[in-house]
From Swiss-Prot:
The modification Omega-N-methylarginine is found at residue 43. Residues 27-151 form the PX domain. One of its GO terms (cellular component) is early phagosome. It is found in: Early endosome; Cytoplasmic vesicle, Phagosome. It comes from Mus musculus. The keyword NADP does not apply. This is Sorting nexin-3. InterPro entries: PX_dom, PX_dom_sf, PX_SNX3_Vert, Sorting_Nexin. One of its GO terms (biological process) is heme biosynthetic process. There is a cross-link at residue 95 (Glycyl lysine isopeptide (Lys-Gly) (interchain with G-Cter in SUMO2)). SUPFAM superfamilies: PX domain. GO terms for molecular function: phosphatidylinositol-3,5-bisphosphate binding; phosphatidylinositol-3-phosphate binding; phosphatidylinositol-4-phosphate binding; phosphatidylinositol-5-phosphate binding; retromer complex binding. The keyword Protein transport applies.
Length: 162
């Protein structure tokens, strides 16, 4: 029988300098969900969240952008991705049906603690989705992240690298 010998030589790498170690990564995509604002009155009341994007990925047309989105916009994005892409889309933070019950002891869906929990859940959702290479090619994701107004009558398509 032939004897196998493990090759234990180290890979040859170039020395790392401070810019390599602490400089910006070669490709990055940072998305923050912040600054919730409740607008409207009565049945027309809802909360919007600021979506801030910073990236150097060439597929995105803007390197920095800020838009405001409400929960129903996240639902739209999720349904578009499920319908049009091969991406397994993570769940959104749940709907708050019981928080709509009148005569609650708190503000229901407008309670500060609920809004903070939802904000964190939405940030986890959008970072998982936008971090997926196939999702990054979907026009609906680009509209959601970078267009001031979402054109819900758009034609679903893929984004081509610039």
């Amino acid at each position: 029988m032939a004897e196998t010998v493990a090759d234990t030589r180290r890979l040859i790498t170039k020395p790392q300098n401070l810019n390599d170690a602490y400089g910006p990564p070669s490709n990055f995509l940072e998305i923050d969900v912040s600054n919730p604002q409740t607008v409207g009155v009565g049945r027309g009341r809802f909360t919007t969240y600021e979506i801030r994007v910073k990236t150097n990925l060439p597929i995105f047309k803007l390197k920095e952008s800020t838009v405001r989105r409400r929960y129903s916009d996240f639902e739209w994005l999720r349904s578009e991705l499920e319908r049009e892409s091969k991406v397994v889309v993570p769940p959104l933070p749940g709907k708050a049906f019981l928080r709509h019950v009148p005569f609650r002891g708190d503000d229901g869906i407008f309670d500060d603690n609920f809004i903070e929990e939802r904000k964190q859940g939405l940030e986890q959702f959008i970072n998982k989705v936008a971090g997926h290479p196939l999702a990054q090619n979907e026009r609906c994701l680009h509209m959601f992240l970078q267009d001031e107004i979402i054109d819900k009558s758009y034609t679903p398509s893929k984004i081509r690298h610039a």
